[in-house]
Design a protein with these regions (language model features):
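Interhelical loop/hinge segments that connect adjacent transmembrane helices in multipass membrane
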Residues: 1-5, 146, 174, 190-230, ...
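Signature of the first transmembrane helix
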Residues: 4-62, 92-100, 125, 155-160, ...
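Membrane-interface junctions at transmembrane-helix termini in multi-pass inner-membrane proteins
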Residues: 5, 67, 76, 128-151, ...
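Helix-loop junctions and terminal segments of transmembrane helices
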Residues: 56-73, 141, 252, 256-291, ...
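C-terminal transmembrane helix end/exit motif
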Residues: 64, 136-137, 141, 145, ...
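Interfacial segments at transmembrane-helix termini and the short loops linking adjacent helices
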Residues: 103-122, 305-336
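Hydrophobic alpha-helical transmembrane segments
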Residues: 120, 149-197, 214, 362-367, ...
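Membrane-proximal transmembrane or re-entrant/amphipathic helices at the cytosolic face
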Residues: 431-496
Length: 496
């Protein structure tokens, strides 16, 4: 079972890797042709799209995930899936109309200027993205990762081609970036509708619609709190600093989002996998292993990105964006804590106690607002990054605490801390003394050797490590046998 999970994670990771690669590919394009202010406008428009998508989804993704894997509802999947898509289509249409009607007032409120056309296009983009996200969720539930990868890659290739055309060739700037998203996701939304109704039929059940909405409705408050949690920093920066600072901050976030290669892949495979194995006798043991592997891999990834952030920025951006280096470590850890929350919330999901996510997220959002109010006016983007990292750490810890009470799992906290603390010290020293690249490479090699040794000593008696060592020994034996097979029997004797 665990092998299947990591196989699916690897496939999802391939798709995520390509997404991140394309993100890297577009970053030089954006930073070369868009000013930090333009990039800031795009980022703020993105925050409007995020809350709109959350409201459109309205927890229906979690609802479908829950009912899709209930054994007693297997035969009802067609009407369940079709009804959920119809709900999504209805909410997406309503969201677009509302954003369109309020576009003029909203843009003046956010930017102090009339960017209503940009916001209307963003409204179209959010509508089609929310429909496309239904497809990606469904494909994961169906455990068809290769289909997910194919469709995702197709979408991304179209997106990157349109970005190059609109921004590089036509010089359309912000408008071009949004239009590329509208067209690429619009095509995928059309495919989603065709796929679902072709595969599951066109059905609508009021009773299933009610079940889906009742299960997901508590998550609307959570979604709103998550939006506050993840976007407050931009609005504080816009108020106390300027739009250009948001652009620089957004580039730092883009760098931190490379962690999505690991976090996103595990997260996409995790929800259907975790719910599917809940009835297995060794489910808790598997949950603990996934938790440990998730944090080990992410700590190592955060170490690399944080240590070499300025070097990465010099390769992929322009000098105007180099100051994003200061926020990268905090934003990286923020991503790790936020994605880790999905891993440790398994107890809440299994026991159907989703209401806990509301107060947990609201608490974290409140802390984020207070910290932004205190820190952003004085230390700018660094204060915003510290605020979101602290808030996501809080949401992770509170979720872990509640989930453990509902469904205890024996996680190995000390082993994680032993890896994290040395990494944090090395990165801090590197930033404080602004170390040269060669010294950072040496420190990185030393840390990885130490971490590898530590992991080996702690895991050498585990079943997985024994299996790996057994395979290595087996390969060695086969190689020796192969070598012996090629030694002739009639070799001449040694003349000596």
């Amino acid at each position: 079972m665990l092998k299947r999970f990591f196989k699916e994670s690897l496939i999802y990771g391939l798709s995520t890797y390509i997404q991140k690669f394309i993100g890297v590919f577009l970053l030089p394009l954006y930073t070369a042709l868009l000013t930090p202010e333009d990039y800031g406008i795009l980022d703020l428009l993105g925050t409007v799209a995020i809350i709109s998508i959350y409201l459109v989804v309205s927890g229906t993704d979690s609802s479908l995930s829950y009912y899709f894997f209930r054994k007693e509802h297997t035969e009802e999947r067609p009407v369940m899936v079709s009804s959920t898509l119809i709900i999504r289509l209805t909410f997406a249409s309503a969201a677009f109309i509302i954003v369109g009607l309020l576009s003029h007032k909203l843009t003046f409120l956010i930017f102090g200027k009339d960017y209503s056309l940009f916001l209307i296009l963003t409204g179209i983009s959010l509508a089609v993205q929310s429909i496309y996200s239904f497809f990606t969720d469904l494909i994961r539930f169906e455990k068809r990762p290769w289909v997910f990868t194919f469709v995702s890659v197709s979408n991304l290739l179209v997106n990157i081609g349109l970005n190059i055309y609109f921004i590089l060739i036509l010089k359309k700037g912000v408008w071009g970036a949004i239009m590329a998203s509208v067209i690429s996701y619009g095509l995928m939304a059309g495919f989603t509708i065709f796929y679902v109704f072709k595969r599951y039929g066109f059905h609508f059940s009021a009773s299933w619609a009610k079940k889906i909405l009742v299960y997901g409705s508590p998550l609307i408050g959570t979604a709103f709190a998550v939006w506050i949690l993840t976007t407050t920093d931009r609005y504080f920066l816009a108020h106390y600093r300027n739009i250009a600072d948001i652009g620089i901050y957004a580039v730092g976030f883009k760098l931190a989002s490379f962690l999505g290669l690991v976090s996103g892949a595990l997260q996409m495979a995790w929800s259907p996998y975790a719910m599917d194995i809940q009835y297995e006798s060794n489910a808790k043991k598997i949950y603990a292993k996934v938790f440990f592997i998730y944090f080990v891999v992410n700590i190592l990834a955060v170490f690399i990105i944080s240590m070499f952030s300025i070097d990465i920025l010099k390769v992929f951006t322009q000098p105007a964006y180099y100051s994003a280096k200061a926020v990268v470590p905090f934003l990286c850890m923020s991503v790790v804590f936020f994605s880790g929350y999905f891993i440790v919330s398994i107890g809440i999901a299994i026991t159907k106690k989703a209401q806990h996510t509301i107060w947990i997220t609201l608490t974290a959002a409140a802390v984020n607002i207070v910290m932004n109010f205190l820190l952003t006016p004085t230390i700018g983007a660094v204060g915003a990054a510290l605020s979101i990292m602290t808030a996501n750490f809080l949401i992770f810890m509170l979720t872990l605490s509640v989930s453990q009470k509902l469904y205890p799992v024996d996680y190995g906290y000390f082993k994680i801390a032993a890896l994290f603390l040395p990494a944090a010290v090395i990165v801090t020293v590197s930033y404080y003394f602004d170390l040269k690249l060669t010294i950072k490479i040496i420190l990185g090699v030393v840390y990885f050797i130490s971490a590898g040794t530590y992991l080996y000593l702690n895991l050498k008696n585990s079943d997985e490590m024994k299996m790996i060592l057994k395979k290595i020994k087996s390969m060695g034996s086969k190689n020796k046998a192969a070598e012996a097979a090629f030694v002739p029997d009639d070799l001449p004797e040694n003349p000596a």
